Amino acid sequence: PRPRPGPPTAAAQTLLCPPPLLGGGFGGKEDASVQHHAALLAYLLQKPVKVKLTRAESIAVHPKRHPMDMTFTLGCDNEGNILGVKARVIADTGAYASLGGPVLERACTHAAGPYHYENFEITGEAWYTNNPPAGAFRGFGVTQTCFAIETLLNRMAVKIGISPWEIRYKNAIRPGETLPNGQIVDESTGLVETLLAVREALEDARYAGIACAMKNAGVGVGLPDTGRVKLVVKESKLHILCAASCIGQGVGTVLVQIVAQETGLDRANIVLEAPNTFTSPDSGTTSGSRHTTVTGEAAHRACLLFNDFRKGRPLAELEGQEFYGEYLAKTDKLGADKPNPVSHVAYGYATHVCILGEDGRIQEMIAAHDVGRAINPKAAEGQIEGGVTMSCGYALTEQYPLEHCVPTARLGTVGLFRAAQVPPI
């Protein structure tokens, strides 16, 4: 029999891993599920190994959204101006932590919504339980606390006699104001504009609901968040090297767009190389809506170096030259001892209106988003439509029942929202 190899030595092991192009990210591919099993078996057996989960195993072990128990108290004056919010968020992270800590941080930094407050107190806890693991899937913890604060705003509007739109417009965060996490928002903040964009449709509808939301870009809260891109001239073409995994976000397309625009090169002369751990610089995880902002800026900086060196010369004269760009999205830790910490480098804002028909079914969804500068408008629209579709399933059809901590649902009964059910958006 072939002798079994011993454990890997302490010396660094160099591994070649060319990740394929995949879809279906949204936080569902952040956790190690079968990768480490396959790698260990392949090392011990010295043979190719494939590990494949059954559908039931996948439903049981892949992280879902965190179940959360949330207690919110909201106060306002007689005109509907919010005076303060107090919230306690308790998350069930399951039998393994996965990203329970970071998810709880996002849930808390977004818990009060995109509104201006004079006073706030927000605490969060994540607990190990015997339930299936929960992770960053679909919203990174933000959807849960968004539901809580938006529901409470509707109740408050009824109590003081103003419309759900008006209470949001009164309290919407505006440039120069401070979010509950202490961060001052800049002049690009566009929540008010999204509210104005949906007002007419909301008022014209007989049955309709409204909600606002905010979402961070980048990992934030003081964690390392660096984008890296290397440009290499090979065979009279400019090659883009970046280890960012393409799992449905369109990061490859965005990088090509940025490089084409910044260098003025025809796209036929730009090559996006597949991620490769031998040659591509590490650009961090594909998570937290970070790559367009963070890795895109790294590409922009590499282009500036390329342009400065090129000085109008043809690519053939630059053969073999390399240009490296790096960008650190620097943020402050939660609880940082400073007056106005920066929790995230950027935020997006949105207002949605759900219009119902006489039968109580969704007739139309209207989504107004402040996306900053849309590098790829079509892709941005697709992400918004995907988010709306997922939220419809989250609100209306999906369920994940457990019996003695074991899931009982099958793929056909978990209630995934079907394409035929998606309303006009």
Regions found by a protein language model. Name each.
Residues 1-18:
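A conserved hydrophobic secondary-structure block that centers on an alpha-helix together
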Residues 29-115, 151, 158-160, 164-262, ...:
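Cofactor-centric catalytic regions
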Residues 130-138, 150-152, 292:
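Flexible glycine/proline-enriched surface loops and loop-helix/loop-strand junctions
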Residues 116-134, 273-276, 424-425:
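A glycine-rich, basic-preceded beta-loop-alpha segment at the flavin cofactor/substrate interface
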